[in-house]
């Protein structure tokens, strides 16, 4: 697999059996995801979006075909090896953030980091840097999950997804249960993470969320019906725009304000709207 491709599928199919009938959710998908890209999967309800995300990340197994992630054919791994691969190579962001209630914020991240790194000091340094990145103050890092707002918990969830330096982060409707304030904050954060070179694959039905992507895949009836290359969001200087404008070192605004619009946002919106209309969305 070329170095610039981090995920590849070959004839990927997923079929579920219900009683005496079969439901073909994914049908012979050939797909490549470039390293460092922000790929967005869209489509109507029941199109197979989440099923595809789970197959790409090893949370589900294909009925037929292959899934190769970071050079490893995960469709051939046994259960234990697949679990280790997910732990070491994949980060996950879901609508519901499943933090361990009995552990503080920092210990939730440390528990993940110590699975892949032996040095407690190095893990703590990385966890603190990631919590700085997502804008969670030091005073809040000793809190327990029950003490966090929905937006704070999602920020911690994204930081936790990055602790193990994953080959890709997989996000399934990450703003689906957040209000507009926190949704904007999480989108800014994902943009920041992508601007630093992280590969992201995200499922969404939301136009504003999709605009953060560099590539849009439209799924319907288990097949990729169309693809749109939006390219990277660019600032006035031509650099990637993440969650904090053109400042590459700034953290996401903890108050949840949207990042400044990139000069090409209007053109991107027009292109995406036209594409979705063509797809019958």
Label the predicted regions.
Residues 165:
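Conserved catalytic motifs of ABC-family nucleotide-binding domains
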Residues 144-148, 152-154:
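Conserved ABC ATPase signature
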């Amino acid at each position: 697999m070329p170095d610039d491709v981090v995920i590849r599928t070959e004839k990927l199919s997923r079929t579920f059996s219900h009683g005496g009938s079969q439901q073909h959710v994914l049908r012979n998908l050939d797909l490549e995801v470039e390293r460092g890209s922000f790929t967005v999967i869209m489509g109507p309800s029941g199109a197979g979006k989440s099923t595809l995300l789970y197959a790409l990340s090893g949370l589900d197994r294909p009925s037929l075909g292959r899934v190769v992630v970071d050079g490893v054919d995960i469709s051939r791994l046994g259960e234990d090896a697949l679990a280790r691969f997910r732990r070491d190579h994949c980060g996950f962001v879901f609508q519901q953030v499943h933090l361990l209630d009995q552990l503080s914020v920092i210990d939730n991240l440390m528990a993940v980091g110590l699975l892949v790194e032996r040095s407690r000091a190095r893990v703590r340094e990385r966890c603190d840097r990631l919590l700085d990145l997502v804008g969670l103050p030091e005073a809040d890092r000793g809190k327990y999950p029950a003490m966090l707002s929905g937006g704070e918990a999602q920020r911690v969830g994204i930081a936790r997804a990055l602790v193990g330096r994953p080959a890709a982060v997989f996000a399934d409707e990450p703003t689906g249960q957040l209000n507009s304030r926190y949704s904007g904050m999480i989108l800014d954060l994902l943009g920041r993470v992508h601007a630093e070179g992280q590969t992201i694959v995200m499922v969404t039905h939301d136009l504003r969320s999709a605009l953060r992507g560099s590539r849009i895949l439209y799924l319907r009836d288990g097949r990729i019906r169309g693809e749109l290359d939006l390219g990277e969001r660019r600032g006035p200087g031509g650099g990637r725009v993440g969650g904090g404008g053109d400042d590459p070192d700034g953290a996401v605004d903890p108050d949840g304000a949207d990042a400044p619009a990139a000069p090409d946002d209007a053109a991107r919106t027009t292109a995406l709207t036209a594409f979705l209309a063509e797809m019958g969305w």
